[in-house]
Design a protein with these regions (language model features):
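Conserved SAM-binding motif I beta-strand of class I
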Residues: 1-4
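A structural alpha-helix within SAM-dependent methyltransferase catalytic domains
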Residues: 41, 72-79, 107
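Mobile active-site "lid"/loop adjacent to the S-adenosyl-L-methionine
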Residues: 47-77
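S-adenosyl-L-methionine
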Residues: 8-51
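Flexible loop/turn segments at secondary-structure boundaries
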Residues: 9-10, 36-37, 58-60, 96-99, ...
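Helix-to-beta-strand junctions that scaffold the AdoMet/dcAdoMet cofactor pocket
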Residues: 22, 82-84
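C-terminal catalytic and target-recognition region of SAM-dependent MTase-like enzymes
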Residues: 46, 73, 87-149
Length: 149
């Protein structure tokens, strides 16, 4: 199940599923992921893998706390849906949340969700998105896979 708040993004996902011949096993909905994840938690749903790719949540330092709250909340909700021993795949695409802070946010979410986590892999962007050390906003992608107990 793929969720996105953007109808255009969902339409593109549907078209890609059709192009790849997987439209019978891939389903997409226009929805607010925060609301859906919360509802699924209330329903007691659990999954082997939950993948989160939220928006940046902030584009300025003035609203960095909003981003921290957003990342923590969506990851907390995602962790609650992961079966014991399953995996949470998550990411962040803002340079204002550096890799160290992103990992701290994930740790805070795990604590609040009362789940133990084991890092499987943590990466930043690939070579086609170069990090230019003298330009602060070029290191922005973070990708994490954790096993959730």
């Amino acid at each position: 199940m793929g969720l996105d708040i953007s109808a255009n993004a969902v339409q593109q996902a549907i078209q890609n599923a059709e192009l790849n011949g997987v439209q019978n096993i891939c389903h997409f909905e226009v929805a607010n992921a925060f609301d859906v994840l919360k509802q699924w938690g209330k329903e007691g749903r659990h999954y082997d893998v939950v993948m989160l790719d939220p928006p940046a949540f902030t584009k300025s330092r003035e609203t960095i706390q909003k981003a921290i709250t957003g990342y923590k909340e969506i990851n907390l909700r995602g962790m609650k849906l992961v079966k014991q021993g399953g995996f949470l795949v998550t990411s962040s695409c803002t340079n204002l949340v550096n890799p160290e802070l992103f990992l701290q946010i994930i740790d805070m979410a795990a604590k609040d969700a009362r789940r133990k986590i084991r890092q499987v892999i943590f990466q930043t962007q690939s070579a086609d998105h170069p990090v230019i050390r003298s330009i602060e906003n070029t290191q922005y992608l973070k990708f994490l896979i954790i096993q959730v107990q």
